[in-house]
Amino acid sequence: NHTITKYIKDAHFYDSTASIEDINYNPDRKLNRSQMEELATNNYIERGLNIIFVGASGCGKTWLSNALGVHACRNRKTVLYIRLPELFSKFEEKRIQGKYNEYLKRLGKYDLLIIDEFLLKPTNESERSDLLELMEIRCNKKSTIFCSQYSFDGWHQLLDGGPIADAILDRIINSSY
């Protein structure tokens, strides 16, 4: 179907061939099959819930997020895959072009936003502000998948602690799987 092909192309997946039917449930991966089957219903998207995948580099977070994203596209959901460093660069570029608010609104409209390489390094003030605005516009309305090498416990420090970190994490965690 042309529409689904376009949805998948427009999502800019790292791996557009990833498929939920091909998920490897090897016990070493510690994937909960029933939870993955629940995610495959796309109910989390309908409810505006987030997903957080945490694990070491190379363990399959990106592939898994892309499999869920491709599945969402097949169900006519709009999806965007982007790495956090790339997202921060885009925010800066749009700010310079005077199109920041327009870009933020567009990001707020995707049914599913997949943010890979989430918080690989500490953030600066501008990045934290951008992240807060993005989470505010999506919170409880649209779903976001976060792929990170660091567990949630380390995120607060990578966001420089304090009230902005609290606000960002509150919007992510309180509506997450």
Can you annotate each of these PLM segments?
Residues 45-52:
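Pre-Walker A (Motif I) flank of P-loop NTPase domains
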Residues 18-42:
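N-terminal pre-Walker A segment at the start of P-loop NTPase domains
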Residues 42-43, 141:
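Non-DNA-binding regulatory cores of transcription-related proteins
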